[in-house]
Amino acid sequence: MARLLPALLLLLLPGNVTGNGSGNGSLSRCPPGQFRCSEPPGAHGECYPQDWLCDGHPDCDDGRDEWGCGTSATPAVPTDNGTEAPTVPAPGRALPARNHGRMWMLITAVLLCCLVAVGGIAAWGKSKAKSRSDIFSLASASKELLVPDKSQADLFS
């Protein structure tokens, strides 16, 4: 019994319990690949994916997940144990994974607007050309050249 008591005490200490922060109040650390915004280290709060650090969108109430981002030096970011650790963004990764859907929606919207504009200009040009085709028709042009109007005949007399 005396041997089990220290083991039970270790299990009951909140600093030694790991979990995902999903709400029972006794969890103090986030699982690997996630971070917590709240301070001090024993505080309880939501866990966020590491991909959300320096993503241009503040997820923490105080914006600490965006602190030190975009500098030439290695930025310091909050970790699950409250200390700050340097991080280097992954090379060639401009947008976080959660924004790729928005990016494709934006690209699709811009392309659709361009297609509608080009189609509208083409339809307008076609209608203008159709309305001018009777003015420049071969039959009316040859008739005007062969039989001058009275007004044109008066000019020569």
Swiss-Prot record:
Domain LDL-receptor class A per the UniProt entry, residue ranges: 28-71
CC annotations in GO: membrane
Keywords carried by this UniProt record: Disulfide bond, Glycoprotein, Host-virus interaction, Membrane, Receptor, Signal, Transmembrane, Transmembrane helix
Glycosylation (residues): N20, N24, N81
Extracellular side: 20-102
Cross-referenced PROSITE patterns: LDLRA_2
Protein's cellular compartments: Membrane
Domain of life: Eukaryota
Protein name: Subgroup A Rous sarcoma virus receptor pg950
Organism (species): Coturnix japonica (Japanese quail)
